[in-house]
Amino acid sequence: MAPRDSAEPLPPLSPQAWAWSGKFLAMGALAGFSVLSLLTYGYLCWGQDLEEEGSLKAQVDERPEAGTAGTSQPHLIFILADDQGFRDVGYHGSEIKTPTLDKLAAEGVKLENYYVQPICTPSRSQFITGKYQIHTGLQHSIIRPTQPNCLPLDNATLPQKLKEVGYSTHMVGKWHLGFYRKDCMPTKRGFDTFFGSLLGSGDYYTHYKCDSPGVCGYDLYENDNAAWDYDNGIYSTQMYTQRVQQILATHDPTKPLFLYVAYQAVHSPLQAPGRYFEHYRSIININRRRYAAMLSCLDEAIHNVTLALKRYGFYNNSIIIYSSDNGGQPTAGGSNWPLRGSKGTYWEGGIRAVGFVHSPLLKNKGTVCKELVHITDWYPTLISLAEGQIDEDIQLDGYDIWETISEGLRSPRVDILHNIDPIYTKAKNGSWAAGYGIWNTAIQSAIRVQHWKLLTGNPGYSDWVPPQAFSNLGPNRWHNERITLSTGKSIWLFNITADPYERVDLSSRYPGIVKKLLRRLSQFNKTAVPVRYPPKDPRSNPRLNGGVWGPWYKEENKKKKSNKTKAKKMQKKKSKARMRKQLAAHSSIKCHPSVATG
């Protein structure tokens, strides 16, 4: 499905600029490549030890797959990791061991030009609606636990569309798309079953979350009710995997299945079972060590999900998609090296994600896709694979990219609106003048058109954070890799193809390109809906809801309130009518001539 309008073609970077950028990149990134090569060697050595020790034990028996005849529609398995950094996978050179992810990706299609959003709610909303944030009103930040806000109810969700063509739809894991009303819950947005958390984070064992002092509650749900039976200290990654196995064990593989598994890992708080620390004692940075253990547990979980797909007869007709929801957070153990920036920013480190597709149904297995892909593309792609229909009047921002992935064809996508956030205007020096009268550069925005990427406003923390496993590089950053944003700057231009690490700002060199991208931003902004970011509601406090985070907005209260309002209006009308009668009565009395009237 095409976006609302097409982008203007932009000229390529000149050969001289390519050469100039290449020299700059070579000097700045050489050390990074040597580090990556060392880590790759260490990972390969560890992989041999892993096979010998058998430390990743399956929780289900590996046995030949049963027949799966009976449906031409594939089973769709979407696995979403939380806060996994771009570098935090073995095949990107990480020191963290991810043999399952490496194997699945190597046998499938690696997505090496794949983009998501910089934080949780936006990525999840775009996956489930196929629309940019500016078209759902979720442009600003995330949905907070105490906000009366959720994914707009007038947006048809992916599971709703899949149910129309006969799919059973199940969600396991983190929702984070709002819950203040019952209509906002996953089971009301297209999922037959839901087992997971409603908030953005929480304790992995107790499943409790405090949003602020005194505002704490339990956050684990079975469909529409608190899952108190699981208040027993089970680590969420393992608990969610067990639920996935149960779903697969009880579902008929001849009937199409959509399974959305949104793991809590590797989001903070940094917690993991003790045995996963075994191979990471040498990592000095404690947050990195804990993060590594969490990621190893996640890798094992996906291993067990894959085995269950095979055991219960789903695998041969399944399409498995793996994605992170945003970049890693270096202060919480994640790494996006050698990309610039982190989670919460519009630099490449915040929005370029780990992603791959694994399936026996792929035509080009064992390949790398470098075509432009965005998280909104999964919506039309999966509906098309499911033999579903998208209404012509629904304007999506995603494209069907299955042929791009499976057959290696060119991507239909030429641009990505990373976001326009009119509320976030922290760039003190931004102005209309800086945007050539086309755009107010105080506004945080980012757009990609072909090779070019433009950022305005304050894009967020902009450092390159090196691998934290190496203590000699310093506790926080490698000083040679740090660049401080220029004072007064509110606009940047990069050629991402030539300069994927965003080291060479070309905004002053190519003002014509800047103007074209600013016009494109302006075009997108004309289609934006108002931002939905309401103030917190004190009724959301779990203490008022049995100690549980959950829907607090009661429809019956609304009716009572409306009835009271009507009664008050009637009283006012009666009162006004009485006053009018009294005034009329007084006006009919004639004044005595000797009585002064003025």
UniProtKB/Swiss-Prot annotation:
Family assignment from sequence similarity: Belongs to the sulfatase family.
Q: Which InterPro entries match?
A: Alkaline_phosphatase_core_sf, ARSB, Sulfatase_CS, Sulfatase_N
Primary place of residence? secreted
What are the required cofactors?
Ca(2+)
- What molecular function terms (GO) are annotated for this protein? metal ion binding; sulfuric ester hydrolase activity
Q: Which keywords belong to this entry?
A: Calcium, Glycoprotein, Hydrolase, Metal-binding, Secreted, Signal
**Composition bias, Basic residues:** 559-583
- Tell me which residues bind Ca(2+): D82, D83, C120, D325, N326
**Signal peptide coordinates:** 1-47
Q: Name the gene for this chain.
A: Arsj
- Which residues, renumbered to this chain, carry the PTM 3-oxoalanine (Cys)? C120
Glycosylation site residues? N155, N304, N316, N429, N495, N525, N563
Q: Any idea what this protein is called?
A: Arylsulfatase J
Q: Which domain of life is it from?
A: Eukaryota
Q: Does the keyword Metal-binding apply?
A: yes
PTM note: The conversion to 3-oxoalanine (also known as C-formylglycine, FGly), of a serine or cysteine residue in prokaryotes and of a cysteine residue in eukaryotes, is critical for catalytic activity.
* Region spans: Disordered: 532-598
Q: Where in the cell is it found?
A: Secreted
What the record notes about the co-factor is: Binds 1 Ca(2+) ion per subunit.
**Any idea of its EC number?**
3.1.6.-
Q: Name one GO cellular component term.
A: actin cytoskeleton
- Which residues make up the binding site for substrate? K174, H267, K343
Native source organism of the sequence: Mus musculus
Entry annotation: catalytic residues: C120 (nucleophile), H176
